[in-house]
Swiss-Prot record:
Claim: Transmembrane is one of the keywords in the record: no
Job description of the protein: Involved in the modulation of the activity of the glucose-phosphotransferase system (glucose-PTS). Interacts with the transcriptional repressor Mlc, preventing its interaction with DNA and leading to the modulation of expression of genes regulated by Mlc, including ptsG, which encodes the PTS system glucose-specific EIICB component. Shows zinc-dependent metallopeptidase activity.
Organism annotation: Escherichia coli O9:H4 (strain HS)
EC main group: hydrolase
Required cofactor names: Zn(2+)
Protein name: Mlc titration factor A
Free-text comment on the cofactor: Binds 1 zinc ion per subunit.
List of residues binding Zn(2+): 111, 148, 152, 211
Subcellular localization(s) per the UniProt record: Cytoplasm
Record lineage: Bacteria, Pseudomonadati, Pseudomonadota, Gammaproteobacteria, Enterobacterales
Length: 265
């Protein structure tokens, strides 16, 4: 019998949190029992250290809080929760939100416009999310808003700005940049052939190195079968950085499903 650490009745608060139900989303089905236990331990600490702030009437219950915490902690399962030290609040809108955006064109003119955002990650500031896209992050589709924004936070640990190169040994930076830019070029070539909507990888990955790292981090965890065979060298670098192999988890899940199917009477 498995003794889950989060089932130990250390406090009324801990026993009230529905961790087992929170784990029952497609994205997390490939985790071993040991990985689930470790992830929940990190998520408990995350909820103790971070403040989840619902906005515009969004109702944040314990199950939603647990699932948000689990997704935040999945990328740092082996890195450690200290990798998420760069923020203290998570702001959660009920749906994509409108922000005022300021940008400068090629001749130096500054423009202001209102744009719809799914999420934002501020340097040494909060992470901003919306619940509709968080819900869409529970499956294994290649889209994951929380992992995308966490990747930006991990990226900025290597400097003042997100560059697409997380905090890795200096000797590995050149190889990482080479493989990341090769992936960007490959994605851009596909976009030019079939268009953004038909591309097999989110076209946003081709916009700049920081977004490429964030988008491919989404695919790394939620659609490894698309990432690994297409960019095998970069895949290995991601595995080394995150110290995880989601493709192995996927194969393990598929093997379990196949075994169960063959034993149905």
């Amino acid at each position: 019998m498995i003794k889950w650490p989060w089932k130990v009745q250390e406090s009324a608060h801990q026993t009230a949190l529905p961790w087992q139900e929170a784990l029952s989303i497609p994205l997390l089905t490939g985790l071993t029992e040991q990985e689930q236990s470790k992830l929940v331990t990190l998520a408990e600490r995350f909820l103790q250290q971070k403040r989840l702030v619902p906005l515009q009437g969004f109702e944040l219950d314990s199950l939603r809080s647990c699932r948000i915490a689990l997704l935040f902690c999945l990328p740092v399962l082996e890195l450690g929760l200290e990798w998420l030290d760069g923020f203290h609040e998570v702001l959660i809108y009920p749906a994509p939100f409108v922000v005022d955006d300021e940008w400068e064109d090629d001749i130096g003119l500054v423009h202001n416009q209102r744009i719809v955002q799914s999420g934002q990650s501020w340097q040494q500031g909060p992470i901003v999310l919306n619940w509709l896209d968080i819900q869409d992050s529970f499956d294994a589709s290649g889209f994951n808003l929380i992992i995308h924004e966490v990747a930006h936070k991990l990226d900025t640990r290597n400097g003042d700005r997100a560059s697409g190169v997380p905090f890795i040994p200096l000797r590995e930076v050149a190889g990482w940049e080479h493989d990341l830019h090769a992936a960007m070029n490959n994605i851009q070539e596909e976009i030019e052939l079939v268009g953004e909507n038909a591309a097999s990888i989110d076209a946003y990955a081709a916009s700049d190195p920081a977004e490429c790292f964030a988008v491919l981090s989404e695919y790394f965890f939620s659609a490894p079968e698309l990432f690994a065979p297409r960019f095998p060298s970069l895949w290995q670098r991601f595995c080394q950085f995150y110290q995880q192999d989601p493709l192995q988890r996927l194969h393990r899940t598929n093997d379990t499903d196949s075994f169960s199917a063959t034993n149905v009477h």
